[in-house]
Amino acid sequence: MNEIKNQIITEKTIRLLQKNQYTFNVDSKLTKTKIKDWIERFFDVKVKSINSLRSPRKKSQKRLPQTSLNDKRMIITLKPEYSIPLFINE
């Protein structure tokens, strides 16, 4: 379960749950197709679509300029007859 880091719970994501959309932070190296296959196998659901976004890199305030990679956030829309449990226990 290293692919999905955590499930995001905010006001916006709770609104998206009504549209059958779930939001996860995932490993930044993964593609949409890999995430889709993994979600369908792990949760036994059918994915309708996936939207992905990355937040800007964080810059350090040290003497030498460095940047760190941020996670990729995926918004996964499921077909109407499927759902995912709200919290993932590790």
Swiss-Prot record:
Keywords: Chloroplast, Plastid, Ribonucleoprotein, Ribosomal protein, RNA-binding, rRNA-binding. It is found in: Plastid, Chloroplast. One of its GO terms (cellular component) is ribosome. GO terms for biological process: translation. It comes from the Eukaryota. One of its GO terms (molecular function) is rRNA binding. Binds to 23S rRNA. Belongs to the universal ribosomal protein uL23 family. Part of the 50S ribosomal subunit. This is Large ribosomal subunit protein uL23c. The lineage of its organism: Eukaryota, Viridiplantae, Streptophyta, Embryophyta, Tracheophyta. The gene is rpl23.
